Amino acid sequence: GIAHAAIAAHLMGLPMGYVRSGAKDHGRQNRIEGRLREGEKVVVIEDLISTGGSLIETVEALREAGAEVLGAVSIFTYGMEKGKKRLAEAGVRAVSLTDFDEIVAVAEAEGYIPAQSVPGLMAFRADPSDESWMGGRK
């Protein structure tokens, strides 16, 4: 998401920063890079949302630093119920440019995947940890 955020910030003439998954072990040991002022309004840009875990961690770090997180934008989301629920519980509003269902529908319509693959793909989206979607393959 950093490259996408940098481009968006540049095109809109806005400042840009990013949140590390953990603080650096050298230098100033910052977790948040870039200028962030108390009460500053922030939109998080992600490349992908699946379970929502990394997005929620990012939002929590920004909130702890005093930012007002308006929401998040992602390029793609799997649209997993677990992720939707977690984001709602954390009070994170997220919108995505496209999602798993749309990509599967277009891929099927354009002949990139056969129709018989669609149920397995939807089973994956519903529960990736249930390997039955693999049709017996591992």
Segments (PLM) and residue ranges:
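Short, glycine/charge-rich flexible loops or terminal/linker lids adjacent to PRPP-binding catalytic cores
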Residues: 2-43, 51-57
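PRPP-dependent phosphoribosyltransferase catalytic core
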Residues: 60-138
